């Protein structure tokens, strides 16, 4: 099957087929090898990327900015002080203006509706760098990291521990379903996966021979796991719920005992970062030999560069 993603936006991986995701991962491998050899091809020379941030960022900003600049492009950082989406000027009109000025737009903020409207009205590729609902570029980096470790994706068992309805867990569940993996969400009933996306993923795995499931039982979830993944207990904008979340999620902390419960010495630990060491994960695990969080963070750049290559060239 010939894959052509030119002009496409990345808003959620629900919009992408397994073949298209595979295409992006193959480009990611290529650009990572180029990066290792310090090869710079200036693929984006003469192009401009608008990067709109409603939420602060380390990895997403670094990944988009370095990926675009390394290839000769000009990234423009726009903070809430620089651009007011929907204030004084409608979001639709701002999108139209941006589309006349730049070649692509990255948005990191709150509402999924915002990134969708930017894509609808700008006429250029738009990339979701994180919304309250989805984090697709993180999920691509997660897939790349898993494949680097196991040489495959199909059949790999991934367990997400903690707040399983957050944007990272949601996008990881979609990615695993699309690629025929076995995804287990493990957390309290109060924070189980979004029912609409969970149902969509249950339909997807019928075609990909994967599986998606939810349980609050650690032993059931962790048995035979290849990957144990977690995220902060209170996401950005939810800091006021931290005490409540700590009480709910303490049983789901990833520690050495949890890693041993997989029954596999080759199980790896992943985290999208930033991490609160001592809360969702212990220092010993995130700094231990099973941790792949730094590879995962680096792979944000390579997968993001791959997305831009595929959609702009």
Swiss-Prot record:
Keywords: Amino-acid biosynthesis, Arginine biosynthesis, Cytoplasm, Transferase. GO terms for molecular function: amino acid binding; ornithine carbamoyltransferase activity. It is an enzyme of class 2 (transferase). InterPro entries: Asp/Orn_carbamoyltranf_P-bd, Asp/Orn_carbamoylTrfase, Asp/Orn_carbamoylTrfase_sf, Asp_carbamoyltransf_Asp/Orn-bd, Orn/put_carbamltrans, OTCase_ArgI. Its EC number is 2.1.3.3. Belongs to the aspartate/ornithine carbamoyltransferase superfamily. OTCase family. Reversibly catalyzes the transfer of the carbamoyl group from carbamoyl phosphate (CP) to the N(epsilon) atom of ornithine (ORN) to produce L-citrulline. This is Ornithine carbamoyltransferase. It comes from Thermotoga maritima (strain ATCC 43589 / DSM 3109 / JCM 10099 / NBRC 100826 / MSB8). The gene is argF.
